[in-house]
Design a protein with these regions (language model features):
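Hydrophobic alpha-helical transmembrane segments
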Residues: 1-24, 201, 215-239
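Helix-loop junctions and terminal segments of transmembrane helices
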Residues: 87-112, 185
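Helix-loop interface residues and adjacent transmembrane-helix termini in multi-pass membrane transporters
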Residues: 71-74, 185-186, 212
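Interfacial/gating helices of multi-pass transporter permease domains
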Residues: 38-46, 50, 67-88
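Short membrane-interface helical motifs at transmembrane helix boundaries
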Residues: 134-155
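Interfacial transmembrane-helix starts/ends
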Residues: 40, 44-47, 81, 113-130, ...
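Interhelical loop/hinge segments that connect adjacent transmembrane helices in multipass membrane
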Residues: 2-6, 12-59, 112-115, 240-249
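Membrane-interface junctions at transmembrane-helix termini in multi-pass inner-membrane proteins
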Residues: 168-195
Length: 249
């Protein structure tokens, strides 16, 4: 078996060596590079902040299920997992409205065409909000209808009030992510502190409320904190946008 693996490797290398790909790679290697990008000075100072911001959000979502599993049992933890999968899928779909515009936003910022930038961004944010709201409402209505008819599948999700709280948090988070994307297109990350504070407060809220009030308390606390943090993100967005655009005009 070991010889067979080595033979497939040698054959693959030989095929590359004899193909046009090898000549293309050799020509690319011979191209002289005049402009170099310093990862240490141009990329890393921005990327480590982005990494911390994303890790903070990831940390919050990964706490829900373990806490509920330990305090409320496997059934409730499974319901939370199913509900999170559904609403996160909706969030991922609706966020494509903003994520696909990142190259356009960045290009307009480079051209300093802030009027066109803001017009496009505002339209995109409205589309994102409407799409996300409609899909979240539709999901809630479907679960409510299935529960009314006692369809077993509906009881694999959280209760309707917990779902509503979670959907409020998801919708608020979508707006916060949209403003964060706008700011990051300027090659800056001013929301690092917001993200860390959000991770700590939401984490503590999850641990405390999940232990004493179950899924309903956990989702309610998360919704309240997410709305407050989104308002904070909006203030940073307004301040930084005004400051950066004034300096660059």
């Amino acid at each position: 078996v070991g010889i067979g693996y080595w033979c497939s490797f040698v054959v693959g290398v030989a095929m590359i060596r004899c193909s046009k790909l090898w000549r293309i790679l050799r020509e690319i290697n011979n191209i002289e590079i005049s402009d170099r990008v310093s990862y240490k000075t141009e990329i890393f100072p921005y990327q480590w902040k982005i990494a911390l911001s994303w890790a903070s959000g990831y940390f919050v979502f990964q706490l829900f299920n373990p806490v509920l599993f330990a305090t409320s049992g496997a059934v409730v933890a499974g319901q939370m997992g199913m509900t999170l999968a559904a609403v996160n899928g909706i969030a991922s779909f609706s966020s494509s409205w903003i994520s696909t515009k990142v190259p356009t936003f960045s290009g307009l910022i480079a051209l300093r065409d802030y009027v066109k930038l803001d017009r496009l961004f505002n339209i995109t944010m409205k589309q994102l909000g409407v799409i996300c709201s409609i899909m979240l409402l539709f999901f809630w209505i479907v679960i409510a209808t299935l529960r009314y008819w006692d369809v077993p599948l509906a009881f694999r999700f959280l209760d309707l009030l917990s779902i509503a709280f979670l959907e409020i948090a998801i919708l608020a988070n979508q707006y916060g992510n949209g403003w964060a994307t706008y700011l990051r297109c300027h090659k800056q990350e001013p929301l690092l502190v917001n993200s860390i504070v959000g991770a700590v407060t939401c984490g503590l809220s999850t641990l405390f409320l999940g232990k004493y009030f179950g899924a309903l308390g956990m989702t309610c606390g998360y919704a309240i904190l997410r709305v407050v943090l989104t308002c904070w993100n909006y203030q940073v967005y307004k301040q930084k946008k005004s400051k950066w655009h004034t300096l660059n005009n």
